[in-house]
Amino acid sequence: MVAGASTGGLYAYTDALCRGLCRIGAEVTVLTNQLWVDLPRPFRVERLLFEFTDKKKQWSQLHWAADRFYRSLRNSLRRNQFAVREHFDVVHFQGVGTPLLDQFFLKSLRRHLPVVLTVHDVKPHYERFVSRASFIKRSLQIPHRLIVHYEDGKRQLADHWSVSTDRIDVIPHGIMRLQNPPDLTAARKKLNLPSNCQIILFFGAIRPNKGLDILLKALEIIKSRNQQILLVIAGGLLGRFNFEPYSDIIKKADLSNYVQTFIHFIPEEEVDYFFAASDLVVLPYLKFEAQSGVLLRAYAHKKPVVVSDIGAMGELVSSDKVGLVVEPSAVEPLAEAVINALDSHDKFQSCYGPELENKYSWEHIAKLTMRSYEAAISGEPSPSCA
């Protein structure tokens, strides 16, 4: 398993998947360029690769780019040499690393070992260079098998990157297991939130494609019909974005008594408090082509959700019946969906039963992943992974 992240969603995903694979009898080695937290694990972690650092941006852009290219080149060489020397049955990459180099080094590795690649973001949030997109496209033609997390992602991968659907396996993203999550009362006390109202949660990095402005406009309708409502906005601002446009909406619509903000990066140890404290999680995204970590966290806490019908979100929520789906940018339908979801809270929450738990269990995800490995090794089409 090749994965660079040592924090955040990709790290948690890789760690959980590797544990699941070990539980069904696989022997797993993770190659990483980061120092993973020193926890007892049933798999081997090799910090073999050079770590990237944005501190190099203190230098000239050219110097920084040259350093990054050098580290990527060394990483690709060391990774391939190590994998071939260890005679792994399959090499599984968690995303495309450096497409300029991957188009060559993945091809070289494929001559010796079966290669599987999970495409977490079918269309990257930011495609800065046309040339990078062409490198990604070439890199995606190389692996024996590609894994995406939802059916529409399979279609998008085929259409956007010209990948044959015969090489694509659909394997859901597993749900993280919560360790002693706080209850609603304790979570609200911790965050200093009121105990006598229904709380809607908007969580995660704040940027224009997340549709927070649409939710705030919908809140003006919602509060006219439910005075005991509070929207909690929790997350940091990315790049050049600022909160001022949202503050203006709050002020003009007289929503200050119905909104509480935590506009900063939320440390991992605090995240569960926000979800535990909420009655409903809303994702009113306008554009989003990846799997949503916020939605998966809501699933982990068994919270009803309202989501836009884009990417994997609408597909999952409609199938699992844990909430309501609305068209993006639709203010009044969003307001109605939030009101109805709160009124039907217990019905939606009851859908988080054993069947859903098994569907997203890491043992089940590991078994589906193993099928993809077996297809890569044999060269035969994979059995259905959905």
Stretch-by-stretch model annotation:
Residues 3-8, 12, 19-73, 80-82, ...:
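N-terminal strand-loop element at the rim of the active site
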Residues 36, 175, 230-246, 264:
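Glycosyltransferase donor-sugar binding loop
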Residues 152, 174:
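Carbohydrate-associated surface elements
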Residues 180-193, 246-247, 350-351:
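A short helix/loop element that forms part of the nucleotide-sugar donor recognition site in Leloir-type
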Residues 194-210, 216-219, 231-232:
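Conserved donor-binding/catalytic core segment of Leloir-type glycosyltransferases
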Residues 244-269:
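Nucleotide-activated donor-binding/catalytic signature segment of Leloir-type glycosyltransferases, i.e.
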Residues 280-281, 304-307:
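Short hydrophobic beta-strand element within catalytic cores of glycosyltransferases
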Residues 319-320, 324-331, 339-346:
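Conserved acidic donor-binding segment of nucleotide-sugar-dependent glycosyltransferases
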